[in-house]
Amino acid sequence: MKDIIYIKNLRVQTIIGIFGWEREVRQEVSIDLEISFDCKKAAKTDSIEDTIDYKKITKNIIKFVEGSSFQLQESLAEGIAKLVKNEYKSSSIKLRVSKPGALRYAEDVGVIIYR
């Protein structure tokens, strides 16, 4: 059984989309992230140094997303995944990126990737 550290419904404004107006107006994206991580050592030591710092990873994701300008959610998701994998050396992650309200009649639309 693997342990999971997660961040759910992180909402960030960015330039994303293929239409002209989407290249000019920041839109909200929602991010869910699950990181496989062995939590045993952190549970034993009760030390932040032995786990993934939620605040730090959230700040890094926000900085990356706010500074990015992608046409596709797939590209944004891949960029976030690379950031997380490089920074935290996780064996695997599950990442969901969505654009709330992007499609009429749908709550949101997005992509889920596993790395």
Pin down the residues of each PLM region.
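N-terminal, polar/charged subdomain of small-to-medium soluble alpha/beta proteins
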Residues: 1-115
